[in-house]
Amino acid sequence: GKAVVLEYLPNGQRMVYDQNYVTNFYLTENVPYAPVRGKDRYDLIEQTLIFKKGVMSEAEVMALLAVIGQPETEEATSMTQWSVVYNLTDLTGRVAVVREYDNVFRFSLDGMIQP
């Protein structure tokens, strides 16, 4: 399978990046008024994938997402809302909501719910 990141920039331009992971910052450089919060988490994902030579199990990826997840704040807007691991081979996904990494929902990308 193929994964991309699609960015809608403030000037209306759309950018597409061949990328298998993303955190909440723009990959496009020099976007006016764009926060860079999340870049450190993005870099940790990238370094881990380089170290693992791009091969990780779903459990390893979810564990990495647990490490980089943002804890709850008073505003409850900056915390990690969800983490998703997609398996592009068998077209399934795993979702952890509000950092509950021990309570993962499984689903199929073809619409069938997995047990």
Q: How would you describe each model-predicted region?
A:
Residues 1-115:
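C-terminal, well-structured catalytic/ligand-binding subdomain of enzymes
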